[in-house]
Design a protein with these regions (language model features):
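Short glycine/serine/threonine-rich phosphate/pyrophosphate-binding segments
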Residues: 132-138
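Active-site acidic carboxylates
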Residues: 1-97
């Protein structure tokens, strides 16, 4: 069984004026990222949207000292970017589509991702997303 982990493809990481944007480089992959995500969903494979989430006044989170505010809960910056947003809205009620709020670089840190993958007997994990030196790497 296989799964796709879609990591941090949000306005703050991709939009031209996003807080920590990859800008044009992130925007270039939109069509391919959306297409592969749709293919995984429609094939019945497990698709996880692992999305960075921060609180504006979280003085204890180490990222607040490293980076400007980004992916803040309740802001446009945290919304999925471009045509990935309507794709998620179209399929979000399917049992093979799962959303994880992550507070750390790793989608495994402080989440139930490991158990979700194990209970589905996932053997092949595919990664897509932006900020590959941080968000995808970890």
């Amino acid at each position: 069984m296989k799964a796709l982990l879609s990591i941090d493809y949000t306005w703050d990481f991709v939009a031209t004026k996003g807080a920590l944007t990859t800008a044009e480089e992130g925007q270039k992959i939109e069509t391919a990222l959306v297409q592969v995500t749709k293919e995984f969903i429609e094939a019945g494979d497990f698709v996880v949207f692992a999305i960075d989430r921060h609180e504006k006044e979280d003085a204890f989170h180490p990222e607040n000292k490293l980076f400007p505010p980004h992916n803040l809960a309740g802001t446009t910056g945290r919304e999925l970017f471009g045509s990935l947003a309507p794709l998620y809205e179209q399929y979000k009620e399917k049992t093979n589509v799962y959303w994880i709020d992550k507070r750390h670089y790793s989608a495994f840190s402080g989440t139930d991702l490991d158990i979700r993958l194990r209970e589905r007997h996932i053997t092949d994990l595919y990664l897509t997303g932006v900020c590959t030196d941080i968000c995808v790497l970890h």
